[in-house]
Amino acid sequence: MLKNDLWINQKASEGMINPFQSNLVRHLEPNNQQKPVLSYGCSSYGYDLRLSSKEFLIFRHIPGTVMNPKKFNPDNLEKTVLHHDDDGDFFILPAHSYGLGVALEKMKVPKNITVICIGKSTYARLGIIVNTTPAEAGWEGHLTLEFSNSSGADCRIYANEGICQLLFFEGDPCTTTYKDRRGKYQNQPEKVTLAKI
């Protein structure tokens, strides 16, 4: 069953999402002015996470190399600069490229819940695809987020604003949680976690 805002708020008060925003934020009010932001916080049947400003990496081509998920070479990634202007803080994801970021919020997934992370339509309409990612029962940490820019133009990816939506699905209690089996991505810090096997 897909869980609603009442359930999300209750579980957040027990530490499921931190920091937690109980309503959907669409505007900030610095100096009493309405500043639009990419929405984040609790919605009717989900929660919009924010992208952390701490780290954003993009893939680069190294001639003569092929990326291997079993032996990932971190040299294929480069850090990007956090930019700032009147619209906010942002990273730039080049056209036809792929990047990795991390969620600002830390999560603790209950033992009978699986979370699915999906993209926001605002970014999808610009050609930015957020990889659909699960967070399994018992998983804890900051989600590493994957982004693909399928458009022919560079695109801003805003930090500290909404980047993806979480959907919470309840199932029968499982025998072994992600935490119980010591999953390889358990307790990810607020930094990009690279591929592991």
Show the residue positions of the predicted features.
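DUTPase catalytic domain/fold
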Residues: 1-197
